[in-house]
């Protein structure tokens, strides 16, 4: 959790936002996936949001569903994902690493064992996409026992009650949805959410990162101008992977230039 606090303090001092890319671990295979993650960090990513392949990712649109399928096709298992996470942490000791999960994967070997394993490999946060705040007690309690930040989603139509719960239970950062629906660059993020960001700050929530439909530098700078601590982009990045499956070096070059441009926009 401290890695998030340190990151946001440093960015605050520099008056810039965070740019956080999302990819699925093991897409399109373990070796290339590790190269992709190194490239994202080298190009300026401030933190990572990583998915563990899951057969029924409800919150995700077709782009990220396909990433899951490619990782499955490569034979990637949750155990291998944890091995990858340990390697990433060893190589990049200070970057915050977040997991985006579904409850079934957390339940598999028991909730406590899951968070213990996260702590062991150096994960900083876990967002369980299909567990609403009001059902989150066993997850967030296990997370905090193991020094893992529980992350909560703040939808654009959140009422005051939900905002207070998200602020009270969340740690690390708050995942602020640009809009409802599923992930996807083809569904561009709506207008910046000034009012929600102000409310979250008023309730002392963890810093808000805006996600869903973030696919251009303009959207990153708009999120930061609206008061968000930064932006998360997933589908736009995964599309670059999908488009370049036959040319791994071209894939890395395009990822590098996309992330550099998105990061530059966070300084606007």
Swiss-Prot record:
Pathway: Amino-acid biosynthesis; L-tryptophan biosynthesis; L-tryptophan from chorismate: step 5/5. GO terms for molecular function: tryptophan synthase activity. SUPFAM superfamilies: Ribulose-phoshate binding barrel. Keywords: Amino-acid biosynthesis, Aromatic amino acid biosynthesis, Lyase, Tryptophan biosynthesis. Its EC number is 4.2.1.20. The alpha subunit is responsible for the aldol cleavage of indoleglycerol phosphate to indole and glyceraldehyde 3-phosphate. Belongs to the TrpA family. PANTHER family: TRYPTOPHAN SYNTHASE ALPHA CHAIN, CHLOROPLASTIC (PTHR43406:SF1), TRYPTOPHAN SYNTHASE, ALPHA CHAIN (PTHR43406). This is Tryptophan synthase alpha chain. The lineage of its organism: Bacteria, Pseudomonadati, Pseudomonadota, Gammaproteobacteria, Enterobacterales. The gene is trpA.
């Amino acid at each position: 959790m401290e890695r998030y606090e340190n990151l946001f303090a440093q960015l605050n001092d520099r008056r810039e936002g965070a740019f956080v890319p999302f990819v699925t671990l093991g897409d399109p295979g373990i070796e290339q996936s590790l190269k992709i993650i190194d490239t994202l960090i080298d190009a300026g990513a401030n933190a990572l949001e990583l998915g563990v392949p899951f057969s029924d990712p409800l919150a995700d649109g077709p782009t990220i569903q396909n990433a899951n399928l490619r990782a499955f096709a490569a034979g990637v298992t949750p155990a291998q994902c944890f091995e990858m996470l340990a390697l990433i942490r060893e190589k990049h000791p200070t970057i915050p690493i977040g997991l985006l999960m579904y409850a079934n994967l957390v339940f598999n070997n028991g909730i406590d064992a899951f968070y213990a394993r996260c702590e062991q490999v150096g994960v900083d946060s876990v967002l369980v996409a299909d567990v609403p705040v009001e059902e989150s007690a066993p997850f967030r309690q296990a997370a905090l026992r193991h020094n893992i930040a529980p992350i909560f989603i703040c939808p654009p139509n959140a009422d005051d009650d939900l905002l207070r719960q998200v602020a009270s239970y969340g740690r690390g950062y708050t995942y602020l949805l640009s809009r409802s629906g599923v992930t996807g660059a083809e569904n561009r993020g709506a207008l910046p959410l000034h009012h929600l960001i102000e409310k979250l700050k008023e309730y002392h929530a963890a810093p808000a990162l805006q996600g869903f439909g973030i696919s251009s530098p303009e959207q990153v700078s708009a999120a930061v101008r609206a008061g968000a601590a930064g932006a998360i982009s997933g589908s736009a990045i995964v599309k670059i992977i999908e488009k370049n499956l036959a040319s791994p070096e071209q894939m890395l070059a395009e990822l590098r230039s996309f992330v550099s441009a998105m990061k530059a926009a966070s300084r606007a």
